[in-house]
């Protein structure tokens, strides 16, 4: 199968490892390389692409700023180094993107933020708003609070979770290697680069090495795990070398890399997950006008809800039924059961008054809603 073209993707997550961002000898940012990457991002941004960056480097920068000795760090030392490094990392990205007139917004997340549905929706909403404003979200694992038991591993899997959370079309993992090989190339001179992976089989997993460095906690194995997460969520993924300047431009020009392809798209995969994998915690009954609106692809507004049943939290799955009690669809609700009861049947301006905050307009956003064909559900 032919490789896709980079410029054909609408929303792209770019993951930058600490071994690329930080010079391991000097402990400082590789400024010229980062400026070249920022120029690549700006070029895609100027073409209308939406870009997100998942950036490692806070611990590496922190240990440099604090002049810590080389060698492994204890957990509390890593957390303290990250606290210093996060400030430097945010400033660096703000400056290099700002040189191109692009705003940057820092988001620090943990494993729970992408696995617990309420926090997942909060992070997703923040990312969506930054993209609406044409800013670039710069995301990092919150190393100051993450522990060994709740880590990802060099942000590869975090990047994959972010990509699926943001419904990205493509995840680019920039690495110190230009893709997946049939064997570790440093050990086997006959190792071949695999340009396209259509399915992650046991053989593909066996090809993953375990190389890592003091500055980078991950290896090829975590990249394969990331590919599983991304492709299951409907996001294509590629691994490419970030050791060259302008790495995204190199990919766009047909440079060496490995593509992991998925037959799904992010919206389809997400809606399949909502419809088939989540246990509903409650029910929203809606009026006939809302049924018509949902079948036309609209979001569910509080004004169309006539009854709320069950005890659910924000982000839980609920069943949506029409006035005849037949199931219309399922979705992730944006309010908990108590607030949903208070605002049912009310207009958007009323919702802000009732709740005392300017909340979300939708009871269920259309991206979080799966509607079945007329008469097919319930």
From Swiss-Prot:
HAMAP family found in the cross-reference section: ProB
Protein name: Glutamate 5-kinase
One of the record's GO molecular function terms: glutamate 5-kinase activity
Entry's Gene Ontology BP terms: L-proline biosynthetic process
Function: Catalyzes the transfer of a phosphate group to glutamate to form L-glutamate 5-phosphate.
Highest taxon in the source lineage: Bacteria
UniProt entry tagged with the keyword Metal-binding: no
Binding site for substrate: 56, 143, 155
Source organism: Bradyrhizobium sp. (strain BTAi1 / ATCC BAA-1182)
């Amino acid at each position: 199968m032919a490789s896709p073209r980079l410029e054909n993707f609408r929303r792209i997550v770019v993951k930058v490892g600490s071994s690329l961002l930080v010079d391991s000898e000097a402990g400082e940012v590789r400024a010229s390389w980062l400026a070249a990457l920022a120029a690549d991002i700006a070029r895609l941004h100027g073409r209308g692409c939406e870009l997100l960056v998942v950036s490692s480097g806070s611990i590496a920068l922190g240990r440099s700023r604090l002049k810590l000795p080389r060698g492994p760090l204890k957990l509390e030392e890593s957390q303290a180094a990250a606290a210093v490094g996060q400030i430097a990392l945010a400033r660096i990205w703000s400056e290099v993107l700002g040189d191109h007139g692009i705003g940057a917004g820092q988001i620090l997340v943990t494993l729970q933020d992408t696995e617990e549905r309420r926090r997942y929706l909060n992070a997703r909403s923040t990312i969506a708003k930054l993209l609406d404003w044409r800013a670039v979200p710069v995301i990092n694992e919150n190393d100051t609070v993450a522990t060994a038991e709740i880590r990802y591993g060099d942000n590869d899997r975090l990047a994959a979770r972010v990509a699926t959370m943001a419904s990205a079309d493509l995840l680019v993992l920039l690495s110190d290697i230009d893709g997946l090989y049939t064997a570790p190339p440093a050990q086997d001179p006959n190792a071949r680069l695999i340009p396209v992976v259509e399915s992650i089989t046991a053989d593909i997993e066996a090809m993953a090495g375990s190389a890592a460095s003091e500055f980078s906690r991950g290896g090829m194995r975590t990249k394969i795990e990331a590919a599983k997460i991304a492709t299951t969520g409907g996001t294509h993924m590629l691994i490419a070398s970030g050791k060259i300047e302008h790495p995204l431009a190199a990919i766009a020009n047909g440079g060496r890399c490995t593509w992991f392809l998925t037959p799904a798209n992010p919206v389809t995969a997400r809606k399949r997950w909502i419809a088939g994998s989540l246990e509903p915690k409650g029910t929203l009954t809606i009026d006939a006008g809302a049924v018509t609106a949902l079948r036309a692809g609209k979001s569910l507004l509080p004004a169309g809800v006539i009854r709320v049943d069950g005890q659910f939290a924000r982000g839980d799955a609920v069943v949506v039924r029409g006035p005849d009690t037949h199931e219309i669809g399922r979705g992730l609700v944006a309010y908990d059961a108590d607030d949903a009861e208070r605002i049912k049947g009310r207009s958007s301006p009323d919702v802000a008054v009732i709740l005392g905050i300017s909340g979300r307009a939708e009871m269920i956003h259309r991206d979080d809603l799966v509607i079945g064909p007329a008469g097919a559900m319930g």
